Amino acid sequence: MFNNSIARFSIGLFVFIFMENSFCTDYNWSANLRYRLKTDTSNDVKENSVSSFSEMRSRISLDVLGDNATAHFILQDSRIVGTPANSAGVTGNTIGSALHQVYFTYEGYKQTFQIGRFELALGNQRIIAKNNWNNTGRSFEGILVKRKTKIGERLLFTLPVVETYDTEYDDSKDHVLSGMYWNIILPGIGKSSKIEPYIMNYQQVQDNGSYNMFGFRADLERNSILF
């Protein structure tokens, strides 16, 4: 039985194809399946006993490519094999798949606008990571603007993290991550050399959880050795 995620996936796909059919000519499909066996090493495991479980993650991706506008859909199913929520071997409703990513991009002059639900990796995943090593991964919902500059690239983003409309009734109390991130290339030092300054703000009025973060990271290449 189709769940709400699959229905939203299908509706979004068909609406986009219908609206952009006049210039969209390319469609790229891809799929992957990852199986992983893990062992439990906690103190709860009795001596001379082995406790293990299996994780499985599958993804189906579709890219709809137009002249200036593109749409990207990634439907993901992530589960631990054999858990009761799967209803394995039993007639019933299983846990549902979900849209891990669904976003649209528009290519303008020196700028790219991206809106929807997407992964965001900054600073070689040291600043913000996709967390794809786990069984689910991390994605954000919001707006991302990329602008090419003479010295590299600038990113501007705003990402609502927690919506509190049903409890606080005040937009200022929503949890929002926003900021700017620069990729500044340094060809005079090495081909792959760059510095990445950033400014970020996390808004969480409750419990005084808001904070600002300033910093930078650097990749410096010398004689083909990257530091």
Task: Walk through the language-model features, giving the residues of each.
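Short acidic (Asp/Glu) patches
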Residues: 98-99, 127-129, 139
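Sequence/structural signature of outer-membrane beta-barrel proteins
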Residues: 36-44, 76-87, 118-131, 159-167, ...
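Signature for the C-terminal beta-barrel architecture of outer-membrane proteins
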Residues: 26-28, 64, 107-113, 131-227
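Bacterial N-terminal signal peptides that target proteins for export
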Residues: 1-10
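Hydrophobic alpha-helical segments of integral membrane proteins
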Residues: 14-16
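Beta-barrel outer-membrane channel/assembly domains of diderm bacteria
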Residues: 22-117, 143-149, 216-225
